[in-house]
């Protein structure tokens, strides 16, 4: 029997072995009620992705993630992945090294929270946008270095770090750009 996956990302590049996966389309658990999760499970969905919010204190973010996990468990759904927070402020490719390191420290804390949720995969944005052409080469190098650090953190919790292909001016608009 094929397993159906409720998933917010349609295509991922997994940083651990850099292979593409097409996993389907769905909805974020952060916007789903317990009734909607139960209905999804009844319809044959087996897996969900939990979106980890970057808003609030670390304790508040942790509680939201664990609440989503409890709701999924109660509905009979398994957590396949967690989507790490992303924003212009949390960009892992920024040129300012101290800002980039602060972003990596925060995302490392978020990965530890994900460890309590138990996903197989973590989804990461390789940048925000817009990115000027004159900055792109260095920002790609910064993103690749940051991905290496976060991949090791993901491995510590037993998860595979997956890089979401992003359109427009974002880094990683195709997998070759980050290889």
Segments the model singles out, each with a brief description of its role:
Residues 50-72, 126-132:
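Glycine-rich, proline-tolerant flexible connector loops at the mouths of alpha/beta enzymes
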Residues 5-14:
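Sec-dependent N-terminal signal peptides
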Residues 35-38, 73-74, 92-179:
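Active-site acidic/histidine proton-transfer and metal-coordination neighborhood
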Residues 23-27, 48-50, 79-84, 122-124, ...:
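Hydrophobic faces of well-ordered beta-strands that scaffold small-molecule active sites
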Residues 31-53, 117-118:
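Catalytic domains of carbohydrate-active enzymes, especially glycoside hydrolases
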Residues 26-30, 51-55, 84-87, 127-129, ...:
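Active-site beta-loop-alpha junctions enriched in small/polar residues
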Residues 20-35:
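Boundary/entry segment of secreted carbohydrate-active catalytic domains
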